């Protein structure tokens, strides 16, 4: 039985949520993941709504993790490694505000850690272009339709842009 009180949440948008979720599910200490939508103005959006680009929502992954096993800073490292944080509203062939690079923080501690990790990455020189990743307070999480949950596990022959990025690192 899980003791939920000791677990924490982290929410990330880094392009198509299928691949982002798949990457985080492989991290030791991640207890569960859910894909969904956050950061927009429409209540209870559907995938079709979000794909119009008119809702303001990002495709996100809500990560529930055990901080005794994996730290938030470790999750930030995964986040930075699985997408290009210098492309505005785009990851590979996926274009639109819903594919933006964004960290939704759940506490002041997460906000500070996210800002510091972005600063360190900017100073590292790893990316030639400016990092455009937004860091915003977490709002309402709207869970995506069931067929999107653990999509790449259910459909192992499918791939997305993120997976190609991971395979080259």
UniProtKB/Swiss-Prot annotation:
<comment type="similarity">
    <text>Belongs to the MsrA Met sulfoxide reductase family.</text>
</comment>
<feature type="active site">
    <location>
        <position position="16"/>
    </location>
</feature>
<dbReference type="InterPro" id="IPR036509">
    <property type="entry name" value="Met_Sox_Rdtase_MsrA_sf"/>
</dbReference>
<dbReference type="GO" id="GO:0008113">
    <property type="term" value="F:peptide-methionine (S)-S-oxide reductase activity"/>
</dbReference>
<protein>
    <recommendedName>
        <fullName>Peptide methionine sulfoxide reductase MsrA</fullName>
        <ecNumber>1.8.4.11</ecNumber>
    </recommendedName>
</protein>
<keyword id="KW-0560">Oxidoreductase</keyword>
<dbReference type="GO" id="GO:0033744">
    <property type="term" value="F:L-methionine:thioredoxin-disulfide S-oxidoreductase activity"/>
</dbReference>
<dbReference type="Pfam" id="PF01625">
    <property type="entry name" value="PMSR"/>
</dbReference>
<dbReference type="GO" id="GO:0036211">
    <property type="term" value="P:protein modification process"/>
</dbReference>
<dbReference type="InterPro" id="IPR002569">
    <property type="entry name" value="Met_Sox_Rdtase_MsrA_dom"/>
</dbReference>
<comment type="function">
    <text>Has an important function as a repair enzyme for proteins that have been inactivated by oxidation. Catalyzes the reversible oxidation-reduction of methionine sulfoxide in proteins to methionine.</text>
</comment>
